[in-house]
Amino acid sequence: YRVADTGMFLQVVDRADLTGNYSETSGSAMVAYALMKGARLGMLPPEYGEKGSRVLDGIRDTYLKKGEQGWELHGICASAGLGPGPDNRTDRTGTPEYYLSEKQMVDNQHGAAACMMAVSEQLRRA
């Protein structure tokens, strides 16, 4: 399900046909981390480490941008989940339309944290 031009995964992974679907940073970073760590621990074949590294490279090439105040990480879904959540929302339905309606953020902590985890695994591969 990787997107050919970014090497990342879509917000709604299996629905490339959806208008507004985009390469999403936090989920892609978690997949990259899992692939690299799994390969390092011998739980996955070694070539999966390289696949994870390519996903992380795609994040860097697509969404890591130099801003006025330094580097910024773009393309992070603000938050998506099921059920009402802490703010008692009723729109968290789990439909593709719901997932695509959540706004994209810059430097959101769950996206940045997932990227830092993936980068730490990529550095261990070096």
What are these regions (language model features)?
Residues 1-16, 20:
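Oxyanion-binding "anion nests"
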Residues 23, 40-126:
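CBM-like carbohydrate-recognition segments
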Residues 27:
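Anionic-ligand binding region
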